[in-house]
Amino acid sequence: MEYKINPIYRRIMLKISGEALQGTENFGVDSSILDRMVLEIKELVNIGVQIGMIIGGGNLFRGSRLVQFGMNKVIGDHIGMLATIMNGLVMHNALHRVYVDSSVMSAIPLQGVCDNYNWMRAIDLLSNNKVVIFGAGTGNPFFTTDSAACLRGIEISANAVFKATKVDGVFAHDPIQYPNHNIALYEQLSYQDVLQRELKVMDLTAFALARDHNLPIHIFNINKVGALKRIIMGYREGTVITK
């Protein structure tokens, strides 16, 4: 595809689930997916797109499952935060291998492992074309990485949040639950549409943050090669949610 000259977004917050990194593996990281992701990120960095990133930890730890068997929710969330740091370090190393400068910032102190989160420092790094990977969520239990992505996106003045999923966007019904049905894909929605139709885009805390700060949300399929770049260059892909 021949792309338009200039990206429509100059600074983005990219949210990748741990599940997306896991790919077809039973646990951990699928190296082929990781390698493809970092090459796509490199391509965007090379055209001047500033990228903040948050990665979930579900490929390494699912606290919600252990809570059912008696684990304290706060402890489970703390372990989940550490899982996001682990994924962040994996991404940091993979970007380094393809000569993309990046920095990992943690919402909880991990001296000697990564930098402490500082929003002014993060903006400075982004402005100098470095990818910034935000780890440990918001640093507080009971908040999802979706909430962290919207919060950090607002703090760094991102133009939009991009949520990478395993489906092509937002559907009227879950296409994974109904694989043999012809379910309509919404190309564009308003925040109000999502609330009225009770569409499960992200948790309500995250969604309210984005809505209240007029932060567009793009939902797209991470397994669709080039999908992220197509959106950033102004082409229709996945679902966009705006006011």
Swiss-Prot record:
Where does it reside?
A: Cytoplasm
Chief localisation class: cytoplasm
One Pfam family per UniProt: AA_kinase
What's known about how it's activated or inhibited? Answer: Inhibited by UTP.
Q: Which GO terms describe its molecular function?
A: ATP binding; UMP kinase activity
Q: Which reaction does it catalyse?
A: UMP + ATP = UDP + ADP
Q: What class of enzyme is it?
A: transferase
InterPro entries from the xrefs?
Answer: AceGlu_kinase-like_sf, Asp/Glu/Uridylate_kinase, Uridylate_kinase, Uridylate_kinase_bac
EC code(s) of this entry: 2.7.4.22
| Gene Ontology biological process terms, A to Z | 'de novo' CTP biosynthetic process; UDP biosynthetic process
Q: Name one GO cellular component term.
A: cytosol
Residues given in the record as ATP binding sites: 15-18, 58, 62, 165, 171, 174
Keywords, A to Z, come to: ATP-binding, Cytoplasm, Kinase, Nucleotide-binding, Pyrimidine biosynthesis, Transferase
Associated pathway: Pyrimidine metabolism; CTP biosynthesis via de novo pathway; UDP from UMP (UMPK route): step 1/1
Q: Where does UMP bind?
A: 57, 77, 138-145
What family does this belong to?
Answer: Belongs to the UMP kinase family.
Q: How does it assemble?
A: Homohexamer.
User: What's this protein's function?
Assistant: Catalyzes the reversible phosphorylation of UMP to UDP.
Specify the protein name. Uridylate kinase
Q: Which organism is it from?
A: Blochmanniella floridana
